[in-house]
């Protein structure tokens, strides 16, 4: 990235310039042109029964395959969330009928381009830049959403038109949305090309009946075919009109939860050419800037001679920021942001930094080794296919000394229940975590060889450890 040092983005001349010298954080909004030209500011989760076409819809809107990783199944449920960004445009010719005047493209598309619709004039202009968070499974989606590893502003609920509604998992997804208190939902009736019109109408009635009395009541139901890209422009229009622009905090000290990290150096690279590690995540609040000094907590975790946990935060500097292929000078909340640092690349290799929190030096929360939580358990297990009409298994109460998986932010760690009474519990964590009182956590238990979400909790207080810092 030549010339980026001076605080001005020079890459991609077709996108809006970002200049650190003239940046006034107090004037930024999630629709500021110089922000949405290069990065997404609204996060939309995609939810739906397996094989109902979530990734296909995301691909139809954004042109991006949210790639899946082979090792995903092997490692507990460390999830790779698939993120895909899309720009949504509106044609500035008032004579063009809706929904044809809406269009979506990938995130590196210019902010304006001439119309190609016969009989219209003018340009398509950028109105929104959204990020789709595509989760493989719903208990994972819930854990992710519950933890707040990504701020979710809205959800697309996918229902396949060629199956009856509701499928067993679909009702759980609604439960997930209820727990998450997501207000803004669009229901997409997918695979409409595979059914007769009468069947589609019948299913539409089923969907209406199904969402009655839930958070999704009154949500628009849009018939689409993701494969044939049919009605995708209607989805774009509804995203613009029905999903309000979320209030965002640009002025606090920045904080980013790391959900991916990697070493971008090729093997055999000359020492002088080595690049620092890259961390990827969604900014929760504040604005990160190129050149800024940062701290990563808990940092490097080790044990002292007595077996006590020690944490040594990592201090570094941001050398580059990017969203998908777009260079940034500063990054705001929303979408997945890559942060190029001067951290030793071996510390970032193969997702080693996942679960850490990155932010301004001295402004990050405490590091906890034990948590006291107030918790809620689900009445029944989610996501377990039951035979016939049998109800899903009941969730048993927490018992002392059992080991649960605790998801805090993007960190999945083991936790031993050391005490439990009524709706309060104490958990001793296997790995220290940087978090604060009031944060939500998700609890999972091993049921028939799988981790299953059994409930969620909120941190009341805990045991913290002081980070060790070198004297130099």
Curated annotation (Swiss-Prot):
Subunit structure: Eukaryotic translation initiation factor 2 eIF2 is a heterotrimeric complex composed of an alpha (EIF2S1), a beta (EIF2S2) and a gamma (EIF2S3) chain. eIF2 is member of the 43S pre-initiation complex (43S PIC). Interacts (via C-terminus) with CDC123; the interaction is direct.
Interacts with Cdc123, as annotated region: 457-469
GO molecular function, one term: GTPase activity
Phosphoserine modification, residue list: 16
Gene Ontology cellular component terms for the protein in this record: cytoplasm; cytosol; eukaryotic translation initiation factor 2 complex; synapse
Residue list for modification N-acetylalanine: 2
InterPro entries, A to Z: EFTu-like_2, eIF2G, eIF2g_C, eIF2g_dom_2, eIF2g_GTP-bd, P-loop_NTPase, T_Tr_GTP-bd_dom, Transl_B-barrel_sf
Function: Member of the eIF2 complex that functions in the early steps of protein synthesis by forming a ternary complex with GTP and initiator tRNA. This complex binds to a 40S ribosomal subunit, followed by mRNA binding to form the 43S pre-initiation complex (43S PIC). Junction of the 60S ribosomal subunit to form the 80S initiation complex is preceded by hydrolysis of the GTP bound to eIF2 and release of an eIF2-GDP binary complex. In order for eIF2 to recycle and catalyze another round of initiation, the GDP bound to eIF2 must exchange with GTP by way of a reaction catalyzed by eIF-2B.
Region (G4): 190-193
Family: Belongs to the TRAFAC class translation factor GTPase superfamily. Classic translation factor GTPase family. EIF2G subfamily.
tr-type G domain segment(s): 39-248
Residue ranges of the region described as G3: 134-137
Note: Has a homolog on chromosome X (Eif2s3x).
Region listing for G1, in residue ranges: 48-55
Annotated residues for binding of GTP: 51-56, 190-193, 225-227
UniProt name for this protein: Eukaryotic translation initiation factor 2 subunit 3, X-linked
GO BP field: cytoplasmic translational initiation; formation of translation preinitiation complex; translational initiation
Organism per entry: Rattus norvegicus
């Amino acid at each position: 990235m030549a010339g980026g040092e001076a605080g001005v983005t020079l890459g991609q001349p077709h996108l809006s310039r970002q200049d650190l010298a003239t940046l006034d954080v107090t004037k930024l909004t999630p629709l500021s042109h110089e922000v949405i030209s290069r990065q997404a500011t609204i996060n939309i989760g995609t939810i739906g029964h397996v094989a109902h076409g979530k990734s296909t819809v995301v691909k139809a809107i954004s042109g991006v395959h949210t790639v899946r990783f082979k090792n995903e199944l092997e490692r507990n449920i460390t999830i790779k969330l698939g993120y895909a960004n899309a720009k949504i445009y509106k044609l500035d010719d008032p004579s063009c009928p809706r929904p044809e005047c809406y269009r979506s493209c990938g995130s590196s598309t210019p902010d304006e381009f001439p119309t190609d619709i016969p009989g219209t004039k003018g340009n398509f202009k950028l109105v929104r830049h959204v990020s789709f968070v595509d989760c493989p499974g719903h208990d994972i989606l819930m854990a992710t959403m519950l933890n707040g590893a990504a701020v979710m502003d809205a959800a697309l609920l996918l229902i396949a038109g060629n199956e009856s509604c509701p499928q067993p998992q679909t009702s759980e997804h609604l439960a997930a949305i209820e727990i998450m208190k997501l207000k803004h939902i669009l229901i997409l009736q997918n695979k409409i090309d595979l059914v007769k019109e009468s069947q589609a109408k019948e299913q539409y009635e089923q969907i209406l009946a199904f969402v009655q009395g839930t958070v999704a009541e009154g949500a628009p139901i849009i018939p689409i075919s993701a494969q044939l890209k049919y009605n995708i422009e209607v989805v774009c229009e509804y995203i613009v009109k029905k999903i309000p622009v979320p209030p965002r905090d640009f002025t606090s000290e920045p904080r980013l939860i790391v959900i991916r990290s990697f070493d971008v150096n090729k093997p055999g690279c000359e020492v002088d050419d080595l690049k620092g590690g890259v961390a990827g995540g969604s900014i929760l609040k504040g604005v990160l800037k190129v050149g800024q000094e940062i701290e990563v907590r808990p940092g490097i975790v080790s044990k002292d001679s007595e077996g006590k946990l020690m944490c040594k935060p990592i201090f570094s500097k941001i050398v580059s920021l990017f969203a998908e292929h777009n260079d940034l000078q500063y990054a705001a909340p929303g979408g997945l942001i890559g942060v190029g640092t001067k951290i030793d690349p071996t510390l970032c290799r193969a997702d080693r930094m996942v679960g850490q929190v990155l932010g301004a030096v001295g402004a990050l929360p405490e590091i906890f080794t034990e948590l006291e939580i107030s918790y809620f358990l689900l009445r029944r297990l989610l996501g377990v296919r039951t035979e016939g009409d049998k109800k899903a298994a009941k969730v048993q109460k927490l018992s002392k000394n059992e080991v649960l998986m605790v998801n805090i932010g993007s960190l999945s760690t083991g936790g031993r229940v050391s005490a439990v009474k009524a709706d309060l519990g104490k958990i001793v964590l296997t790995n220290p975590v940087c978090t604060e009182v009031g944060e939500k956590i998700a609890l999972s238990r091993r049921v028939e060889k799988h981790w299953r979400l059994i409930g969620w909790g909120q941190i009341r207080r805990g045991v913290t450890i002081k980070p060790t810092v070198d004297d130099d």
